[in-house]
């Protein structure tokens, strides 16, 4: 449907019988109205043509072959001549056969039938609105209980029942036997009701606004009572309050959407278009039918039997009529949701029939597989792995995926550069993977972003744009900082890659969807690009070390993996001498030469602004020299001062991991400052 803002949308909800009739009914040019499916047959076993008024009727759903009626006559579709647009003999219109994909039919039910989704699914909408136990409503729907109609100021049999309370159970059996079928129908229509018709009557009598007001009043009264001190009573009150809230919300929803509650009881059953429940022939000519066809046949058989009982038979007991109504209800339940009431219906091979719910729900259902997750051109899919060397706005695309996604662009590039004379030659060069193919592919990818999507896409950061680069292997490389937006990790997650084709899509990807432009959460504004997963583990390994400072060597000398591993003997006390470096470059060079480890403690000359040292820490030890200079030794650094207490130099105790981390942060801040200065 299209709303007032011209947005295409799909709305799922209850439908009125008038709307179902409007979908299915159509008036032929001769004035005949068709649309009702009355026969449970599909194809004739001799002619192999659809049966008239059956589940594949061409009069109802349209011709199987475009422009050809059931008689075999042909008319040109769209011909503006004044010839009749339908066959006068068989009543089939000369239209396109694609109409069988959307033209619906309907089954006129002989008795009302509740929609099992609204009755059995939890929470039960019907039970919530009527404020009655679900078991009681089920007994009413399946004709196990009877519902007394309020007949005022009239003598009734049910009023006499009050005088004989001990015979209440016998009335259920004695009343039907007392009357003939015609008399019982009169009595039942006047005084009692059962089946889905009783539910429909109660739903039609509801005042939704009164339900909302009364539920709110009761909820406030329960809230004012407070705790009773009895745990069981408090839980009961809490459940009642939760139920009242659900009931108010449900009633408000019906009011807001302008939907009548009695629509949850069906009088007309829609029949799906035949192309959505096909019958095909497999090898050997054996027909293979959709399970829904068999379930529709079951409904039609039972509905026709009930119609015959109500219209033709005069001596059928009322109990048999109610039993047949129950069978119709169960058949419709199986069609809508097989197995929701217990044991599912099976075929002769003990295979469970796939109902309408099975067709549309789940990962392989119509919505997730065909509508939401359908395969499209210029798209691929692969496992994601971490790419720590990538920029935030880049992703690594495998060569095998990239050459398929950008194949048309590469073909155009080969022809423009006169490396190929036609499309066939260009494709052969791509199959042979000639070097010029990769050169052109690199040029194409430099100016073309791609979209990465990880299902489920629950918010807008579930799909972001990246600048692709070629990588080896078959996995997509992803920067770990963008994992939180995708809710992804590197334990086997898969992501889909799409190529925006139009200029508008590419502009939107560059201006709005690039990963480095989506650093904040659109919901709460917090940073979304934060270290997670492998980055946290890497930062921990990078900055780990002995946090006891200089005291570690004095009281617990256990680290023997240091520079030169030089040990000094002083009164039988052994400790490891820690190396000293004048610059961070020397320390990193020693690490690359494997002379020290990543977490090896070392001393580094601090050459930055010494005025930033503003610590109130008391030195562990102060060592004086003969020239007046002295050393203040702290837990993680050492300050050398002259006689005037001026700082001459500072040595800090750190590790190679801390040095690397500090340099990365420093370079990032400097780059950010340069970018800001360019922007201003």
Curated annotation (Swiss-Prot):
Organism this protein belongs to: Nandina domestica (Heavenly bamboo)
Enzyme class: transferase
The protein's required cofactors: Mg(2+); Zn(2+)
Functional description taken from the UniProt entry: DNA-dependent RNA polymerase catalyzes the transcription of DNA into RNA using the four ribonucleoside triphosphates as substrates.
Domain of life of the organism encoding this protein: Eukaryota
EC number(s) given by UniProt: 2.7.7.6
Binding site for Mg(2+): 489, 491, 493
Similarity field: Belongs to the RNA polymerase beta' chain family. RpoC1 subfamily.
Name of the protein described by the UniProt record: DNA-directed RNA polymerase subunit beta'
SMART domains with a match to the protein in the record: RPOLA_N
GO molecular function, one term: zinc ion binding
Catalysis performed (reactions): RNA(n) + a ribonucleoside 5'-triphosphate = RNA(n+1) + diphosphate
């Amino acid at each position: 449907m299209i709303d007032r803002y011209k947005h295409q949308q799909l709305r799922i909800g209850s439908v009125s019988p008038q709307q179902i009739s409007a979908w299915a009914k159509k008036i032929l040019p001769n004035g005949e109205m068709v649309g009702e499916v009355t026969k449970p047959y599909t194809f004739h076993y001799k002619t192999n043509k659809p049966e008239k008024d059956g589940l594949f009727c061409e009069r109802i759903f349209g011709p199987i072959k475009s422009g050809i009626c059931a008689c075999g006559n042909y008319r040109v579709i769209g011909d503006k001549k004044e010839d009749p647009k339908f066959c006068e003999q068989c009543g089939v219109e000369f239209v396109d056969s694609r109409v069988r994909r959307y033209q619906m039919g309907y089954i006129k039910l002989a008795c009302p039938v509740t929609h099992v989704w609204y009755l059995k699914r939890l929470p039960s909408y019907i039970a919530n609105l009527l404020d009655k136990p679900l078991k009681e409503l089920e007994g009413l729907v399946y004709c196990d209980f009877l519902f007394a109609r309020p007949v005022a100021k009239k003598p009734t049999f049910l009023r006499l029942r009050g005088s004989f309370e001990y015979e209440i159970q016998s009335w259920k059996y004695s009343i039907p036997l007392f009357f003939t079928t015609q008399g019982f129908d009169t009595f039942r229509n006047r005084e009692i009701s059962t089946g889905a018709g009783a539910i429909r009557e109660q739903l039609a009598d509801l005042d939704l606004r009164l339900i909302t007001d009364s539920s709110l009043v009761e909820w406030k009264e329960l809230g004012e009572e407070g705790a009773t001190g009895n745990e069981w009573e408090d839980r009961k009150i809490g459940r009642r309050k939760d139920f009242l809230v659900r009931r108010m919300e449900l009633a408000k929803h019906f009011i807001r959407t302008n939907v009548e509650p009695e629509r949850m009881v069906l009088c007309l059953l829609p029949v799906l278009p035949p192309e959505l429940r096909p019958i095909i022939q497999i090898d050997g000519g054996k027909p293979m039918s959709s399970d829904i066809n068999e379930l529709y046949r079951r409904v039609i058989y039972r509905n026709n039997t009930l119609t015959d009982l109500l219209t033709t038979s005069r001596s059928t007991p009322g109990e048999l009529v109610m039993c047949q109504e129950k069978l119709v209800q169960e058949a419709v339940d199986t069609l809508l949701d097989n197995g929701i009431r217990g044991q599912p219906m099976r075929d002769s091979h003990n295979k469970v029939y796939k109902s309408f719910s099975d067709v549309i729900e789940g990962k392989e259902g119509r919505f997730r597989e065909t509508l939401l997750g359908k395969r499209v051109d210029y798209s691929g899919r692969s496992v994601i792995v971490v790419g720590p060397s990538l920029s935030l706005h880049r992703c690594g695309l495998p060569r095998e995926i990239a050459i398929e996604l950008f194949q048309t662009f590469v073909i155009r590039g080969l022809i423009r550069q006169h490396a190929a004379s036609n499309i066939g030659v260009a494709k052969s060069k791509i199959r042979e993977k000639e070097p010029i193919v990769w050169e052109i592919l690199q040029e194409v990818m430099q100016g073309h972003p791609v979209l990465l999507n990880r299902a489920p896409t629950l918010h807008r950061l579930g799909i972001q744009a990246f600048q692709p680069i070629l990588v080896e292997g078959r996995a997509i490389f992803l920067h770990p900082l963008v994992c939180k937006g995708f809710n992804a990790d590197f334990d086997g997650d898969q992501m889909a890659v799409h190529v925006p084709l139009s200029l508008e899509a590419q502009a939107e990807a560059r201006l709005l969807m690039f990963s480095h432009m989506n650093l904040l959460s659109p919901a709460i504004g917090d940073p979304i690009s934060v270290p997670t997963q492998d980055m946290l583990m890497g930062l921990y390994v990078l900055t780990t070390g002995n946090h006891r400072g200089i005291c570690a060597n004095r009281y617990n000398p256990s680290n023997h993996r240091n520079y030169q591993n030089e040990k000094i003997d002083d009164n039988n006390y052994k400790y490891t001498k820690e190396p000293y470096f004048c610059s961070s470059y020397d320390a990193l060079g020693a690490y690359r030469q494997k002379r020290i480890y990543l977490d090896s403690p070392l001393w580094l000359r601090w050459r930055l602004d010494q005025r930033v040292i503003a610590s109130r820490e008391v030195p562990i030890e102060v060592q004086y020299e003969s020239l007046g200079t002295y050393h203040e030794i702290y837990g993680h650094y050492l300050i050398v001062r002259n006689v005037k207490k001026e700082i001459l130099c500072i040595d800090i105790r750190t590790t190679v991991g801390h040095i690397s981390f500090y340099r990365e942060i420093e370079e990032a801040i400097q780059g950010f400052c340069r970018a800001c200065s360019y922007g201003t």
